[in-house]
Amino acid sequence: MVFLKRTRRITMNSLTLTLSPEQVSALEAKYPSYVESPPPHSVLRLKIDGLTITAYQSGKVLFQGKGIETFIQKNQLESLMETSEEKSKDTPSLPKDFSSWSVMGSDEVGNGAYFGPLTVASAYVSKENIPLLKKMGVKDSKDLTDEQIRAFVPKIKEVIPYKLLTLWPEKYNEVQQVKNLNEMKALLHNQALRLLSEKIMPESPEGYLIDQFCKPELYYRYLKGQPLVDKNKTYFITKGESHHIAVAAASMIARCAFLDGLDSLSTEFGYKLPSGAGSNVDQIAAKILKHNGMNILRKVAKLHFANTEKAKRMKE
């Protein structure tokens, strides 16, 4: 996920891109009179002169109908389009037998959820511990229920070293004024990897694997002037959890922390805060705005999401 992540799929009357929450919010703010009720699992639908635009919770945005190219050019979204040739050039690769290396992996959870913190975890899995974690059933957190995550993670923490960082909504909103989402994630991933590297010294991983959310050159540009882990041993790949179990373990630890954070905020402020960014989220946000105001909403939610503007309209 680059701040504006590139993805593909283009046909004569259809185009799918991946946009950041900021991009979706900008489209909604620019075309308020064209907003329609979004379908299930989506956060925004616009109908503009024969063109239908649907933004989904996953970050995917589907453009259907007439005038796609004109709209893309008008809104300066050309850089998001990617030909299959460019895609093949950009596809990263890992060394042979990487999945059996001793690796430190990192992953984040919460960047697509309106309520709750952004959590980043790093986990170190030595080659000796790989069979044990596989036997335990460690896998990508998205493939597990919340209950399974909460049952699994304490056991994982007993077996491997890890580092967990949590960026709570109030601080997130403050930082988001000067840094984009991917810059925040880069700083957190780097810090989680560095702190865990110090924790396991003198042992050192054979490789570092970051669940890729932007191109490596952009990642390092965000970290200019920051101390880094060994760049020569650092790899980036999407769906990192399928390439090494260290990323899967980090994903589970980060997911558990996100769920705990959501529960903690729910208890503190007296609302059952849902995950995701769907219509149920809009309803709770509108209630908070109506009864408690923006000062409380900023403590529990990521305000730059399109949900904030929707909640404001619902409150009225």
How should each PLM-predicted stretch be described?
Residues 3-316:
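RNase H-like, Mg2+-dependent phosphodiesterase core
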